[in-house]
């Protein structure tokens, strides 16, 4: 294994944010946007990335076995790069990203800072969502975020609100 970052279970509320209150979300319970691990390993000379969520409810029938969460994984491949992540979030100066991966229960998409998008091969291995980013193994920086899936948002990530709300 190249790396394994683990995150404590049960910290998916960020700055005291509430999960949506729509029936679909209430029935799923909480914890489905709780990232518990991100890992990278080498398989047959190629980098493979993996993430694990606390829970995988799938009321919308996502082929990867979940449908309510979106995870974003940004990789810093070379010096420089795009420093803007999400609104209000930036990388340290000079440590921007060159490849981002949007992970939903409906697939994984690679995005470039210029806006290019392409689907990448993804699958499940037990509790892990696994994908092949098409990169050689290397010493890359990484940034991540997890939130609620919004299929209409540019990064499939629902804007957060301290109030909760239906969606």
Tell what function each PLM region has.
Residues 128-135:
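Exposed aromatic-hydrophobic patches
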Residues 95-126:
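Extended, solvent-exposed segments with strong compositional bias
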Residues 1-5, 77-94, 137-167:
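Acidic/polar low-complexity flexible segments
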Residues 2-5, 9, 21-105:
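Surface-exposed, glycine/proline- and aromatic-rich loop segments on solvent-exposed faces
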